Amino acid sequence: MSADTCDWQNFSPGDLSYAFPMISSGDVSASIARSSQAFPTWAALSLEERRGLLSQCGDNLRAKSEEIAVLITRETGKPIREARLEMAAAIAKFDFTFADGERFLRDEAVAGGPHPALVRHCPRGPAAVISPFNFPVHLGHGATLAYLLAGNTVLFKPSPMAANVGLVYAQVMQAALPAGVFELVQGWAPVGQELCLDPVVRAVCFTGSVPVGKALSVALASDYSKSLALELGGKNTAIICEDADLALAADAVADGMCLTAGQRCNATSRVLLHRSIADRFLDLLQSSLKRYRPADPLDETTLLGPLIHFSAHERYEQLISGSEGEWIVPGGILECNDKEQHGFYVLPAVVLVNDSAALDASPLAKCETFAPILVVEIFDKEPEAITRHEAWAFGLTASIFTSCDDAFSRIGALLSVGNLYRNLPTTFSPSTLPFGGWGNSGNGRPGGRSFLRFAVQEQAVQWKA
């Protein structure tokens, strides 16, 4: 750390380290001022004009796709095959967002009143997008596109744990957009706080932890006209019914808990398992998990990369040392692992818990794990599974594994989640649909046309014929 830079060491010390410029309060204010100055001109463009400029951004991103994918892997440890999928999803968001904007952002005629009327969807102003490290392009990019297409300007703050990715992404966007329309703001939490609390910023999209999301809600409570979209993660559950395809369920659970080393808001961190098929399912799960052996994330065959940082590695070790139940897959670090040289690689871990009260009081229940750790609980009857699911305060995703249509409908109707799946991993989240949670998982919907609702404010227009 120097007076002018903030040093960051990535997941594999000695491989990629860098220093990004420290942002002063004056720098943040200057970025906000440029964003505010650019807003009226950008908002005055037609939808077609904004879409045309954003299409150029899409062309730029496509041209840089492989370069950015490799950078994502080197900077965060995400396996290269996942990083490429992230870039493909980000590029696909252009067409999805354009199609949704065409349907939703046009003036809407409303009949049946005393006068001719329409609803106009108006931009809010400068918008802050706070992006996480685990999907350093894809997650912030979806909100960014929606805000920009709707006529807002964007102040983009990437995670400092993926600052290089954020820089290249910003360069791609800025190359096609007028000055001030897309501003890059690098820095740690105080920078994000200043950005979000500035009264000139009229919308905030934050992806991150529950404590920070709640703190933002409290801090912005008095500025009730500011739009706040929160995507705060989850404790995502797979419910395995007695008639489930167990091989399919085991592979889906293994994928859900291990993709991105469990560092996904929608990662599978819990299984509710019917007693009659428990032994068979757990045997299949252990076999499926053998696919996920930590290895070099730049290797095309690697499925499980490292955790992002030493602090995440330490937290993983603390969690698997708990006494909540029987660790049927014990997890741990690689025997050859040297934290100072080879990165923060860990093994998948599975704990079978019989004492639900002890579990509910433990960090395994109260906090996002953000590591490949799975809690398994046994149930005998459907109502018991539903009660146990609803005992936890998160509500992002859940998946029900059953061959019965009625069982899926019956159980699913009683689960408080924003995303419900059948016979799919909890990590399944196509960009065509709203993505977001209930309860502690937030209020944002950064997917499908739903996020456009956060990007605009409605104006009812009537006139005397």
What are these regions (language model features)?
Residues R106-L248, F379:
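Rossmann-like NAD(P) dinucleotide-binding subdomain of oxidoreductase/dehydrogenase enzymes
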Residues M1-H115:
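N-terminal Rossmann-like NAD(P)+-binding subdomain of aldehyde/semialdehyde dehydrogenases
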Residues F94, G166-Y169, M173, L195, ...:
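Hydrophobic packing residues within well-ordered alpha-helices of enzyme cores
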